Amino acid sequence: MAADESPASPSELSECFSAEDYAAESLAADLDPWITFDARKTPRAEFSSWLQSHRPSSVSRYGDGEAGAGPVGWIAVRGPDYSEQSGDVEGLQDSWETLLTSGRSVSFQNIRELALNHSVLDGKWLMHLDTGFKVDRAWESIARATVLEGKIWSAKVSPRDPSSNSRHVICVYNQNFTDEEQVVRLDSAIRAAGVKCVLYYKPDVYTYLGIYRNNRWKLCPTIYESMFDLESVPRRSHILNKVTNLELS
């Protein structure tokens, strides 16, 4: 899984930071140690105690020297059907450099073509939550749906950053961002877990290519937005394709 968006929500991110700043921050988190529960390797009987011991609001991003705890990049869970499939990232980045030097326009369609050519197809729904009860409750629901129910492939959450006012980000993954039905099914699984907040969907190819907020190509860093409608019967998500500006039916 690649590094992701800042824990701050899109509306909170400062215009003074460049896409390169956000990419560097995310890469640093990705390279630091992760706390991971892998349902393929660890008995499920140990999951509840693991979950309680590693609540995102109580795990410090930069560790605790007095307690002998080191930095933590992410807290992650992997479901029983999880498999590593990052594709040909090096080839993707080489093709990206070729595109940039060719003079061709940079667009979602061109990037989608690169992703398909190099099998870099993972994507994730992102949610931004305040530290404390809100993030701990949402993370517990997502993690249980991943490890115990197998409804979600994999997920991760950022630990608490005591040095800033940034919120936590939870990333919930699927295997193919070009499969619209799969993207919608993952949204449904997240909503079934009890999450009602706004969600944003980002393909991993954007992350690998450094496409964050304030990028020089002026691309929106997310391609779907999901708003949960509490008043509809039955309750449902309204998912907007931000590339076409059309709502998914």
Swiss-Prot record:
Pfam families: Bles03 (PF08939). InterPro entries: Bles03, TIF_eIF4e-like. Disulfide bonds: none annotated. PANTHER family: UPF0696 PROTEIN C11ORF68. Belongs to the UPF0696 family. This is UPF0696 protein C11orf68 homolog.
